[in-house]
Design a protein with these regions (language model features):
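Metzincin-family zinc-dependent endopeptidase catalytic domain
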Residues: 59-156
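Short, small-residue-rich loop/turn micro-motifs
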Residues: 38-42, 98, 150, 165
């Protein structure tokens, strides 16, 4: 007798509407170069325009944030991330604050146009976070501002978009399921 086995390397299509339990709106960026910056002193959130006093980021937090954008950038070919040289103008503004509202350690807001193209986004991160918890949180929030939603924790996947987090991110490459999701969202 002869046995054969088949390995499928083509990822299946993910049904985002079923996968994400919140924060998914069917929107994405339609530009190749996306800039980001840390807010200085005060910032307003993208959608609700709530005002926050922000804390200057430490060198470690700046480096973790650069790493987070690099990790997402390595996973999606159609987008390049660049830290903005202009403190008043960036596509994504990040603020570190004391006492993020609610039970959150971070949250995001975006605005988009009638074509479901994201035009501006903000990320708020809790000041008390450090190390890999900060990195995990900023990675998750970047996933949100790229257009991905939040996933209820599951045994069959490993994703930075799981909420609450199931593990802290310590690698240098995005997890396989996250790569699959972002490539699907951006038609790669």
């Amino acid at each position: 007798t002869t046995s054969t086995s088949t390995t499928t390397t083509v990822p299946e299509i993910i049904d985002f509407d079923k996968l994400f339990f919140e924060d998914y709106f069917g929107v994405k960026w339609n530009k190749e170069n996306i800039t980001w910056r840390f807010a200085e002193e005060r910032m307003s959130t993208a959608y609700l325009e709530e005002e926050y006093s922000v804390i200057k980021p430490s060198i470690n937090r700046i480096n973790y944030t650069k790493k987070a954008f690099q990790v997402w950038g390595d996973a999606v070919n159609s987008i390049n991330f660049k830290q903005s040289e202009n403190s008043d103008n960036a596509d994504i503004t990040i603020g570190i604050v004391d006492n993020v509202p609610g039970r959150n350690v971070g949250f995001w807001e975006s605005t988009w146009n009638e074509n479901n193209e994201i035009t501006y986004a903000t990320i708020i991160i809790e000041n008390s976070l450090g190390g890999t918890v900060f990195l995990t949180t900023i990675l998750h929030e970047i996933g949100n501002v790229l257009g991905l939603g939040d996933i209820s924790p599951r045994q069959d996947i490993r994703s930075i978009q799981e909420d609450p987090f199931q593990e802290n991110f310590v690698g240098s490459s995005l997890w396989e399921f996250d790569v699959q999701m972002i490539k699907q969202l951006y038609d790669e």
